[in-house]
């Protein structure tokens, strides 16, 4: 599969690393949405990784970012983004801003991204980083992700980047009819669920085994 055009390799040596990441880690494992591939190729993942882990910025593994949190491996970011079925007009809610990498990927595709982070310092760092990269379609909130962000609901897609042991009811309520919820659920044996909301039901489209950090928040008991 051909990749979409990207920036000049000479101007940014990490472009080649992103090209290789997308070909070897993303396309090779079945993610093929052109918008998702273009976003992963465009966003400089190394800008979201601690200085001490720069040599692993484009490796196929999660990395610690402090405060007990991680940046997900590139494949999981791609899988979740593709599963959300985004369009250029989508309004997306992300639970767990973390370092901001997933928010950047979403912002490359969707019209608006609303992201909630419970750890104030992570939220501030992510906002500074994303604004420095020029993103103007991301809205930020420091708060309890379990409760979502009802002010701007409903959302066409909701992505959760930490695992509760059950599906948070507020998120189900804030998902638009026709929208997708992508969420890891469980404690020891987690699965990443892709749920589609219809006018009468919530349908499971697919699920894979995963391991995410636990969801934190006052409503959740952490």
Curated annotation (Swiss-Prot):
The active site is at 72. This is Protein-L-isoaspartate O-methyltransferase. Catalyzes the methyl esterification of L-isoaspartyl residues in peptides and proteins that result from spontaneous decomposition of normal L-aspartyl and L-asparaginyl residues. It plays a role in the repair and/or degradation of damaged proteins. Pfam families: PCMT. Belongs to the methyltransferase superfamily. L-isoaspartyl/D-aspartyl protein methyltransferase family. HAMAP family: PIMT (MF_00090). It comes from Picosynechococcus sp. (strain ATCC 27264 / PCC 7002 / PR-6) (Agmenellum quadruplicatum). It is an enzyme of class 2 (transferase). Coiled coil: none annotated. It catalyses: [protein]-L-isoaspartate + S-adenosyl-L-methionine = [protein]-L-isoaspartate alpha-methyl ester + S-adenosyl-L-homocysteine. Its main location: cytoplasm. Its EC number is 2.1.1.77. The gene is pcm.
């Amino acid at each position: 599969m051909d990749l979409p055009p990207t920036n000049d390799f000479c101007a940014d040596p990490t472009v080649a690393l992103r090209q290789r990441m997308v070909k070897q880690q993303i396309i090779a494992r079945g993610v093929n949405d052109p918008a998702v591939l273009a976003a992963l190729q465009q966003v400089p993942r190394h800008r979201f990784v601690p200085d001490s882990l720069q040599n692993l910025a484009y490796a196929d593994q999660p990395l610690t970012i402090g405060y007990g949190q991680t940046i997900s491996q590139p494949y999981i970011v791609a899988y979740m983004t593709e599963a959300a079925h985004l369009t250029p007009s989508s309004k997306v809610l992300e639970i767990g801003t973390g370092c901001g990498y997933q928010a950047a990927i979403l912002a490359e595709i969707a019209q608006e991204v609303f992201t909630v982070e419970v750890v104030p310092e992570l939220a501030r760092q992510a906002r500074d980083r994303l604004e420095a990269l020029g993103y103007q379609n991301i809205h930020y909130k420091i708060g309890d992700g379990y409760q979502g962000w009802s002010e701007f609901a409903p959302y066409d897609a909701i992505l959760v980047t930490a695992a509760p042991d059950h599906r948070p009811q507020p998120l189900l309520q804030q998902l638009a009819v026709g929208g997708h919820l992508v969420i890891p659920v469980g404690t020891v044996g987690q699965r990443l669920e892709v749920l589609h909301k219809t006018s009468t039901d919530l349908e499971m489209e697919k699920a894979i085994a995963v391991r995410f950090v636990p969801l934190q928040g006052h409503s959740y008991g952490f």
